[in-house]
């Protein structure tokens, strides 16, 4: 489309925006990697509808280039970290998480807590850099934004919302142990049938699995800290000039947009200010580049396999790469492998390596037979959207849980990255490609994903616009946020009722004893007479 026609369309959109009075100003607290990709999809749609979107990003941000022309307005605040330092730090922590042994529950989650705490320290530093920059804060405040939008896993947006007195909306995939969802959002997760995230359990639990799930619940509720909460609580209290906590401030969110859906997640109760918008980034496939299309077409009736371990995994040992390449070389399908490393010695003629692939477009291609994935939520939703069965090789975070969900739905097979042999991967591929049940099951999930009265992206945008129109959505916020923990669990009421029952029992007992004493005394007196 020419620049002329683009300008005309933009002018029409803006004219409609101003005439309807629905044009708003959205402030965004930046996220990184897949977290940003999900938010970016929503922001692009907001811009298409004529809203003004401004993103607050640090000078170290990996995904933002202030010189890159974009409809997004980027406000860069200075920080002492460099892009390279931040990227290296993130990659080091991800590798550390991926390499954690899962043999011991306590050791594994203690290490996860330490990693999350380090991430929290970096995020808190960025937050301090913003709120301590008086000139920058004044500039932002004078812009008079209507709403703040952010990923809840990167705190600070709620502090800005409190300082600027504007409503805010969260986007969130998950937090370890549902920490933020439960303690800040007031979400309800009955442990009898809702498995704790990262437990790799399903909603069909045996007695011993329910015992295991309860242990997870108790651990995450009373021991695990997603960040160093004391530091965050102290920081927020100092900035706001009154005692407060991170959880309390996050609990003031008007709407939570959870990047999940019921064809993926096991059912549990939802609050009025929570909506599921999983798969909002999914869209119909576009034509492939000619060279890639020619390779796909050369596969004939056998079709192709798409293989990607995501954007956050850039280093793989030569030994692991050769194990994988050897398995891929033995299947009749052609393979498109996203791999940014040295060419494996065992690479077959049927396999091509790419530093980047148009994953959504490949998954939507009619010749795609299977998807080898690390289990990232974005990739899984794209596979569901296009109806492609999966072989899961989870690495860290929620990925094992995601693959467990797909296994429970009969849409995936799992292999272990560190211990799998070429035969293991080969058998898994043959199973999902040759067993028609996997294709049937994932197509069922796909039909559910498509059969929605309102698309997830439209729902996400609706709620942000709703909050802007009504200057918040406090009428949807449950009163549980205003209760103490013992009031929430009705411990004060239970205690009062127990005292009442005990009092009644005491009085009745005393009355019975008194009556017994009176009758006994009368009987004794009559006997003496």
Swiss-Prot record:
**Bilayer topology:** Single-pass membrane protein
Quote the annotated effect of residue 399 to A.
Answer: Abolished androsterone, hyodeoxycholic acid and tetrachlorocatechol glucuronosyltransferase activities
For this chain, one GO molecular function annotation is: glucuronosyltransferase activity
One Pfam entry for this protein is UDPGT
Q: What is the effect of changing residue 379 to S?
A: Abolished androsterone glucuronosyltransferase activity; no change in hyodeoxycholic acid and tetrachlorocatechol glucuronosyltransferase activities
Question: What's the superkingdom here?
Answer: Eukaryota
SUPFAM superfamilies, per database record: UDP-Glycosyltransferase/glycogen phosphorylase
Q: Which residues are glycosylated?
A: 67-68, 315
TM ranges: 493-509
Q: Which GO terms describe its cellular component?
A: endoplasmic reticulum membrane; membrane
Question: Residues that bind UDP-alpha-D-glucuronate, according to the entry?
Answer: 373-379, 398
Q: Catalytic activity, per the record?
A: glucuronate acceptor + UDP-alpha-D-glucuronate = acceptor beta-D-glucuronoside + UDP + H(+); 17alpha-estradiol + UDP-alpha-D-glucuronate = 17alpha-estradiol 17-O-(beta-D-glucuronate) + UDP + H(+); 17beta-estradiol + UDP-alpha-D-glucuronate = 17beta-estradiol 17-O-(beta-D-glucuronate) + UDP + H(+); 2-hydroxy-17beta-estradiol + UDP-alpha-D-glucuronate = 2-hydroxy-17beta-estradiol 3-O-(beta-D-glucuronate) + UDP + H(+)
Q: Give the residue range of the signal peptide.
A: 1-23
Q: What is the effect of changing residue 378 to A?
A: Abolished androsterone glucuronosyltransferase activity; reduced hyodeoxycholic acid and tetrachlorocatechol glucuronosyltransferase activities
The UniProt keywords, alphabetically, are:
Endoplasmic reticulum, Glycoprotein, Glycosyltransferase, Lipid metabolism, Membrane, Signal, Steroid metabolism, Transferase, Transmembrane, Transmembrane helix
Protein's cellular compartments: Endoplasmic reticulum membrane
Q: Which GO terms describe its biological process?
A: androgen metabolic process; estrogen metabolic process; lipid metabolic process; xenobiotic metabolic process
Q: What is its EC number?
A: 2.4.1.17
Its primary localisation, in coarse terms, equals endoplasmic reticulum
Q: Which family does it belong to?
A: Belongs to the UDP-glycosyltransferase family.
Q: Which purpose does this protein serve, as stated in its record?
A: UDP-glucuronosyltransferase (UGT) that catalyzes phase II biotransformation reactions in which lipophilic substrates are conjugated with glucuronic acid to increase the metabolite's water solubility, thereby facilitating excretion into either the urine or bile. Essential for the elimination and detoxification of drugs, xenobiotics and endogenous compounds. Catalyzes the glucuronidation of endogenous steroid hormones such as androgens (epitestosterone, androsterone) and estrogens (estradiol, epiestradiol, estriol, catechol estrogens).
Protein name, UniProt field: UDP-glucuronosyltransferase 2B7
The organism's taxonomic lineage, starting at the top: Eukaryota, Metazoa, Chordata, Craniata, Vertebrata
